[in-house]
Amino acid sequence: LSEKLRALSYSNTPDALPQELARALFQPGGRYVSSMTRLETYRSCPYKYFLQYGLALEARDEGEIQNLDLGNYLHAGLHQFGSTLTRQKRQWRDASDEDIREISSTIAGALSEKMKYGILSSDATSRYTKRSLDRTFRETLTFLRSWSQRSEFDTKDLEKAFFFHLAKEDGETLTISGKIDRFDVKDDAIAIFDYKTGHTEATLAEIVAGLKLQLLTYLLAVEQEHPEEQLLPAALMYIYLSGNVTKVEQVPPNGNVNLSEKDHASGYVLADPSLLKSLDKDAGESDSCLPVRFTNDGSLHKGSASALTKEQ
């Protein structure tokens, strides 16, 4: 009875974690090392951050293909293909149809064997998923080659690791680490790209709120690595590997699997028409990946909200 009476006046007011407990959960090695994904998670939902990164809770692996697995598959494939071109001192625009077909086949074969102990070849449905995924992989490579052929920018680096330190008010240091999927250069101009599976956008409101900070952090990391250079940020963009990559629940009657809409990109670009044309000579046209439009006199359309000045 006394417990029930206490329940009447109970107030579920969350308290801050004791400092020692917080250190044990989030600084097991004595240092706080984080990523922008983690910090974005905290800004979005502190409780989710606590469960995911403090208690290390995760969904039970039931041995099934998840959308995250498919995204990692495509991401790893693009990195390996790009690295192959880099070793050969070639750009994306230099890849032939035969390169895309043969190199992607080799990469896909190796990746599928590593995915959950070869689950992509475990049954007919999974094998259809694999073939559909491989097709999406080839289509994405073709898309990236096409863009590169329209661009004067060259790929400078892939999976570029970075870290920097931020001083906290209590005197300790917060280390931010991460990897930049890809950045391209032309003279002193840089374009930073982050590969995403599915549609992802970063509004200015989300950036100000700390919910979408990856692209800006990548730019900061590149600038800090080249302090002697006056880099010109031409573009900060997400490249969509697929609009809707999902596992195939059952083999369709016609044998075709509709995985995605046309690959494209979103983000922010510098409001410089000539620079944008060097990033994509079709900038402003319907088939361009740059989110801008031009007026008849060649200036940027006022409705091009994704085009910002350098000061912005």
Spans of model-derived segments:
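Structural signature of nuclease core domains in nucleic-acid processing machines
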Residues: L1-Q312
